[in-house]
Amino acid sequence: MGRMFGTDGVRGIANKELTADLAYKLGKAGAFILTEGTHRPKILVGMDTRISGDMLESALVAGILSVGAEAICVGVIPTPAIAYLTRKYNADAGVVISASHNPVEYNGIKFFNKNGYKLSDELEDSIQALIRDDFKDVPVLTGENIGRKIEEDGEAIRDYIDFAKSTIKGDLKGLKVALDCANGASYITSVEAFKELGAEVHVINNKPDGININRNSGSTHPEDLMEYVVKNNCHMGLAFDGDADRCLAIDEKGNLINGDFILAICGKELKKQGRLKKNTIVVTVMSNLGLDIAMKKEEINTIKTKVGDRYVLEEMLKNDYAIGGEQSGHIIFSDYNTTGDGLVTALQLAHIVKESGKTFSELCSIMKELPQVLVNAKVSNDQKDIYLKDEEIKSEIDTITKNLDGSGRVLIRPSGTEPLVRVMLEGENQKEIDKLAHGLAKLIENKVK
């Protein structure tokens, strides 16, 4: 059995890879491992709008109840809401059934511990080991020891909306905002929060039917929103993904504003308020060099981690930083939540736009994005580290780096899933870096022939 858990829980095609049987086992093992020693543990269960959610929820909950835990089912709700509410309700764990930005046929199961954090690799391995060993030493409960399912009646959504609203001071009156909910989990929460704060709210893709989640919509397909913002003279647009743990933005001219720009704008604002701990933002190695240059001018440090919001969060927790995130729009505000939170990000950004008295595009001029080129070089899995060993490749990387002279960079990343390495170059001249990236990729491929 290979490793069941990926970077964001267990994910696969629902009913084929992520079956009801597997969901039952994950519920049983997760509840047992996460609540050991607790008399009558409580586990919060939420999901996005996928058609397979009902099937997987039924199986997952059956597993939870079989080991004597209570399952509190809150229905369709954003992933970050489960992270927050697990803490607020003093639950012993939280589970979300969602495949985030993936197409409808996929689904996933993701656990949070009692503090609202994603699980460590060690805990995930313990859950997998229990399933692999066929629940050896797990007692079979009967009678009054079996757990109960509790259907929650909307209080959870209300509590999450109130929490998200509380993260900004004042209101959003006078702001005209377009929201794209991706026909996903934020179709109620995001719309209500913005309306209650006084914004003029226009919404697209907020009619989920079980199969239209992420379809040509949301943060992975923002084209319709870009058009809508311009056509309707909105001050800004905000696009969520299926489980609303990420958010991208659109300026009033219809330009897509990615996570790097959001981090730059929010980082500068936090510093102004004296809330940017250690004057540092945490980003990944894939963030644009333009962000580093912009932050240097603002006397803000950038610390880089491996790709993945879990690594960003690890770094933030280790050194008590206030903000971090990825280009994809996973932004973590550690003062507010324990994971990327699309609605909290959207509200911070909207509030900054309103209070600044500037247009969104003016705020975005804080940063100039450098041209970026990504080229794949095909290599076998056992030769993915050749760029670290081969002298000619190392020398070529050094030469390119020297020639870019601080206004560009080379980054090589082995793929975690395919037999290739990704060659990424950034610099001021698109044509030049294009040529250099393709040349370097070719050199790597020639060396492994």
From Swiss-Prot:
One of its GO terms (molecular function) is phosphomannomutase activity. The modification Phosphoserine is found at S100. CDD domains: GlmM. It catalyses: alpha-D-glucosamine 1-phosphate = D-glucosamine 6-phosphate. Mg(2+) binds at S100, D241, D243, D245. Coiled coil: none annotated. Its cofactor is Mg(2+). Activated by phosphorylation. GO terms for cellular component: cytosol. The keyword Thylakoid does not apply. Keywords: Isomerase, Magnesium, Metal-binding, Phosphoprotein. One of its GO terms (biological process) is UDP-N-acetylglucosamine biosynthetic process. Binds 1 Mg(2+) ion per subunit. The active site is at S100. It comes from the Bacteria. Its EC number is 5.4.2.10. NCBIfam families: glmM (TIGR01455), PRK10887.1 (NF008139). Belongs to the phosphohexose mutase family. PANTHER family: PHOSPHOGLUCOMUTASE (ALPHA-D-GLUCOSE-1,6-BISPHOSPHATE-DEPENDENT) (PTHR42946:SF1), PHOSPHOHEXOSE MUTASE (PTHR42946). Catalyzes the conversion of glucosamine-6-phosphate to glucosamine-1-phosphate. This is Phosphoglucosamine mutase. The gene is glmM.
